[in-house]
């Protein structure tokens, strides 16, 4: 599918209605969850429900969803125009003084209390994000709403985000396209230095975005002390630095007989993709080359068997089987992939003991890898979509067995 075809597909969707549908689906689940309302602060969750990303979260963005009725988006007055232009939630309330805006309160928590009163959530059971908010926030919410009971809905939100609709998958196709561009350029510069490979990939991704995709945002989600305006990233590590897992690139030039691992990440309208490739620099030691070929075999196994209906543990077993056969049982990874979407690392983990049944629309990485401390690693990572009868592989590189 070409970039233009993907863009044409996206035009068929009513973006704001898709976000409204997510809210409606959440409301439909509230009786089962045993809650009367849900209050979200986590940037990925508030975006998932509202379609609004202020980029900088120094002032909280809050979505309050009652079991019945319309959801409310609460933002600082500074974000009034931005949220009005982009959010799918119609009822936007403001807090904090800024220019000539008319906030309902000076601070977010007083505003939440007013909204809870309007939505008749005072004295009701409230769902909260136990994996995100602090104890102080929990206590404030409970006090403001007079909730007799608070229910952690974190797992529900994680699972809701994991299954993507076709609109989200098209965005993932575009972010994957950018990582593919970046990876090809990183491979062309891999022998120069970690820094050269990394920056050349980032430049290529940014130039491609500017020429072909600049109508889409490439930001990610910040926190209360900063924001991520541009989420087109690459880092390449070499030799003994590869097992660090994630490290800033430096001036190190890879040596003959080592491996390099360039990692390209990209986001389009909030949806992230990951593309990683292990590159052999010349001839590597036989034992490590054996591990490299086992990695390719494990990856091929997963591509062949992965589909809706299989379990995460079955995927794991297929991915590591060639490692065991090749004598690397003592080096097996804890997982061979993870969910991607509004975060680079999200639910679920493709781990040995995870009996989660994969469903159509789930988006995960496939990355069966080995780590050899002090030497390097063998790992490719691809972003894939689980389909009824197989998978759709979104990421790629010019070849699989990479020698430079």
Which role does the model predict for each range below?
Residues 1-404:
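Active-site neighborhoods and metal-handling regions in enzymes and metal-associated proteins
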């Amino acid at each position: 599918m070409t970039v233009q075809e993907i863009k044409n597909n996206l035009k068929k969707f009513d973006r704001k209605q898709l976000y409204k549908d997510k809210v409606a689906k959440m409301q439909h689940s509230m009786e089962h969850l045993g809650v009367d309302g849900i209050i979200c602060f986590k940037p990925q969750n508030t975006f998932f429900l509202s379609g609004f990303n202020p980029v900088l979260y120094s002032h909280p963005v809050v979505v309050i969803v009652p079991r019945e009725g319309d959801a409310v988006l609460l933002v600082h007055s500074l974000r009034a125009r931005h949220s009005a232009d982009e959010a799918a939630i119609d009822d936007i309330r403001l807090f904090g003084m800024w220019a000539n805006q008319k906030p309902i309160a000076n601070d977010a928590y007083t505003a939440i209390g007013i909204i809870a009163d309007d939505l008749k959530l005072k004295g009701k059971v409230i769902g909260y994000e136990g994996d995100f908010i602090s104890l102080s926030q929990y206590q404030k919410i409970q006090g403001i709403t007079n909730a007799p009971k608070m229910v952690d809905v974190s797992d529900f939100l994680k699972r809701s985000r994991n299954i993507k609709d076709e609109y989200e998958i098209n965005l993932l196709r575009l972010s994957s396209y950018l990582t593919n561009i970046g990876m090809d350029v990183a491979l062309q510069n891999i022998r120069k230095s970690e820094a050269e490979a990394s920056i050349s990939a980032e430049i290529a991704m940014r130039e491609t975005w500017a020429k072909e995709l600049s109508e889409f945002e490439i930001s990610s989600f910040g926190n209360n002390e900063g924001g991520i305006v541009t989420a087109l990233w690459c880092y390449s590590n070499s030799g003994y630095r590869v097992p660090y897992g994630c490290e800033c690139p430096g001036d190190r030039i890879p040596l003959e007989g080592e491996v390099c691992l360039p990692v390209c990440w990209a986001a389009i309208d909030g949806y992230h993709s990951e593309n990683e490739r292990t590159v052999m620099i010349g001839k590597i030691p036989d034992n490590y080359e054996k591990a490299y070929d086992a990695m390719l075999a494990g990856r091929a196994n997963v591509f062949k068997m992965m589909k809706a209906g299989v379990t995460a543990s079955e995927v794991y077993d297929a991915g590591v089987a060639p490692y065991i056969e090749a004598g690397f049982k003592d080096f097996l990874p804890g997982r061979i992939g993870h969910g991607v979407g509004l975060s680079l690392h999200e639910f679920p983990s493709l781990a040995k003991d995870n009996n989660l049944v994969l469903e159509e629309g789930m988006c995960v990485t496939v990355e069966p890898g080995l780590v050899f401390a002090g030497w390097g690693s063998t790992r490719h990572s691809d972003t894939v979509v689980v389909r009824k009868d197989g998978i759709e592989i979104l990421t790629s590189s010019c070849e699989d067995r990479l020698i430079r």
